[in-house]
């Protein structure tokens, strides 16, 4: 069997490295490969122009591989890593949505690790590196993965709220939503899906539990919100994790949940040498994540760093939302001029900074002790950084130099 891998990313590298003994060498295609070479395992590294769909039995793309790429268009036997590993996949919980996927996945794993739950997918470990003999896989599942998945399904599908994101990749918000909901048509009567009430009528054989907001979801599972130490925007994530535990074990482990430690880069608070508050929310790459961050600090004047790769999303609603805050903006990245234009139309004060270090220095000239400086950019980072994590790291380094 000849397996072709599209893109030389974390997912496809894990497949090539972990399954070479079972399948022999793989053909790996990536735009960065100019000439044909072999890696240390004997896999062929090929330019996409060399792909012959008549010589390939299965094609597996990296999750974020563009659907309009010529390799995708030529593929005859395309499947996601979820489909590829479905036959050996144990019982699984898939967690998706626009914001909160990672936190909910981590919280649910924290609650269920004692029964043999392991975490993977879009966060942490690729499926090729997960142990199929574990009792439960909890998978953070992106819209990219769902787009390419046509066979696999979970026993529990937990869907957090959906808002516009990755529109340049999906083509439209409707396409994005449909990819998020696509798994429902493969689920059966023994499966459960938790999803926002707006999607409650989506055709599926699964048992649907819909919710309007945190309070509604908590009520559906008899969860006492007063016993949860996490506040918005992480409250819904915590309730969803408890709901998953309730379905599987019929228990609610509040104390264990409250012992969970949040990861970096999500509303990560730091103080500078003058005891002023700076918040690293670099992972906020869409408008709903930024809105959640703004609501968290609504009682303070906010100095917001915004901009980067906007992924083709119209952010007009976000800037209209900002009108209700005491806020000044600091525009960075490839979308600097676009951010300034949004700000002008919304009558919001904005500074042209272009790069993160300049934005931090500009804020430092204005920031008072009772105010907050917030990096919550509403955009991806790849225009100027290797990842959102690197952007957060640079932000903290700049703050520490003040």
UniProtKB/Swiss-Prot annotation:
Q: Where in the cell is it found?
A: Cytoplasm
Pathway participation = Cell wall biogenesis; peptidoglycan biosynthesis
Enzyme class (EC, first level): ligase
Q: Which domain of life is it from?
A: Bacteria
Mind giving the lineage of the organism this protein is from? Bacteria, Pseudomonadati, Campylobacterota, Epsilonproteobacteria, Campylobacterales
> What is the name listed in the Swiss-Prot or TrEMBL entry for this protein?
UDP-N-acetylmuramoylalanine--D-glutamate ligase
The record's listing under NCBIfam families reads: murD (TIGR01087)
Q: Which reaction does it catalyse?
A: UDP-N-acetyl-alpha-D-muramoyl-L-alanine + D-glutamate + ATP = UDP-N-acetyl-alpha-D-muramoyl-L-alanyl-D-glutamate + ADP + phosphate + H(+)
Write down the InterPro entries for this protein, in alphabetical order: Mur-like_cat_sf, Mur_ligase_C_dom_sf, Mur_ligase_cen, MurD
Q: Which UniProt keywords apply?
A: ATP-binding, Cell cycle, Cell division, Cell shape, Cell wall biogenesis/degradation, Cytoplasm, Ligase, Nucleotide-binding, Peptidoglycan synthesis
Q: Which processes are annotated in GO (biological process)? A: cell division; cell wall organization; peptidoglycan biosynthetic process; regulation of cell shape
What is the primary gene name for this protein? Answer: murD
Give this protein's Gene Ontology molecular function annotations: ATP binding; UDP-N-acetylmuramoylalanine-D-glutamate ligase activity
The record's EC number reads: 6.3.2.9
Q: Which SUPFAM superfamilies match?
A: MurD-like peptide ligases, catalytic domain (SSF53623), MurD-like peptide ligases, peptide-binding domain (SSF53244)
